[in-house]
Amino acid sequence: MAVIAKFSIALLNKAIPLRRFFSAAALGLIVLVSSSLVFADGESGAEQLRQFVRNSKTAEGEFVQQQLRAPRANESQEKGLKVVRETRGHFVFQRPGRFVWDTQKPYEQKLITDGKQLILWDKDLNQATFRSAGQALATTPAAILFGETSLDQHFDLVDGEDRLGMKWVALVPKKIPNTKNGNDLPYTKISVGMANGLPKALELIDGLGSVVLVTLDKIQLNVNLPANRFTFVPPAGAEVL
């Protein structure tokens, strides 16, 4: 769980095993699509992202999350970044602040929030961790998808290059008054890849150069969701932290 390994760490607690966080994305990072959204040709990636955030009330789809690294000195440099870890699964969200990030392969793990608390369920460990959501969603990449529609309140959106068939938008966290570093995010760069008005990828880079890439597919927008979709009750005998 890498791209979101650190993403989840920001949401929950650094004391929780790293493996459990590979299912977050950025929070970050997780974005959805809809054929009902119409965007003008040539519209900037930043404006496409703003419109997507404004128009998406609920959504669900599939994700692939990869942790990448540069090749070492004794490895071939020809193939570029190497995949260190990869997870796959399903995600659901409902604004404001509700989501399920359901990792299904290579292990089963869920990150759930109803807007009030965050729950991390690890099936292999038979363990559920509960944390207060608080301002976490507003100050992390999760705000891109799961928060309210005020994306510009927390980030400056800067149009970047066209790459891999997408228009990339850099999200620069706005400085938070009375904090030493201006923000608590563990990333030096947060980018969203837009294509035809739809967010297709989320890329997170930390100070050590580690890259987490989340790609999204089979997205359905503004779907009807049952009220209990964002609740979770640990099974009998599970450890609760």
Give the label of every model feature segment.
Residues 24-34:
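Bacterial N-terminal signal peptides
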Residues 65-67, 95-97, 103-107, 115-117, ...:
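A mature extracytoplasmic/lumenal domain signature
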Residues 42-58:
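Short N-terminal segments immediately surrounding and downstream of signal-peptide cleavage
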Residues 36-40:
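Sec/Tat signal peptide C-region and signal peptidase I cleavage site
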Residues 120-146:
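Acidic/charged, solvent-exposed loop-and-adjacent secondary-structure segments enriched in E/D, K/R, S/T
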Residues 3-26:
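Bacterial N-terminal signal peptides that target proteins for export
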Residues 54-115:
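N-terminal mature ectodomain segment of secretory-pathway/periplasmic proteins
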Residues 42-43, 129-131, 153-156, 160-241:
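Gly/Pro-enriched, hydrophobic low-complexity segments
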